[in-house]
Amino acid sequence: MALKEEFEEHAVKAKTLPESTSNENKLILYGLYKQSTVGPVDTGRPGMFSPRERAKWDAWKAVEGKSKEEAMGDYITKVKQLLEESA
């Protein structure tokens, strides 16, 4: 299976993660997903009155140095890990 196809499959699986998944892990997945699909951060950092959006932006910025392919691989690995932990 091609990396992009596997990534898309795991993006669907990520939506089945339990609500108990930590915010930290959700933010890691968000950052890797954005890096995989958009690439480097292309917006300014949200202000302090938007803490949720700011945390998401920070998670994306944290993985900015990864290639799209590397981010896809890391995303797949993280989703697999979280699914195993929740089983």
Swiss-Prot record:
The keyword Transport applies. GO terms for molecular function: fatty-acyl-CoA binding. An acyl-CoA binds at residues 30-34, 56, 75. This is Acyl-CoA-binding protein. GO terms for biological process: fatty acid metabolic process. Keywords: Lipid-binding, Transport. Residues 3-87 form the ACB domain. It comes from Fritillaria agrestis. The gene is ACABP. Belongs to the ACBP family. The keyword Transport applies. Pfam families: ACBP. Binds medium- and long-chain acyl-CoA esters with very high affinity and may function as an intracellular carrier of acyl-CoA esters.
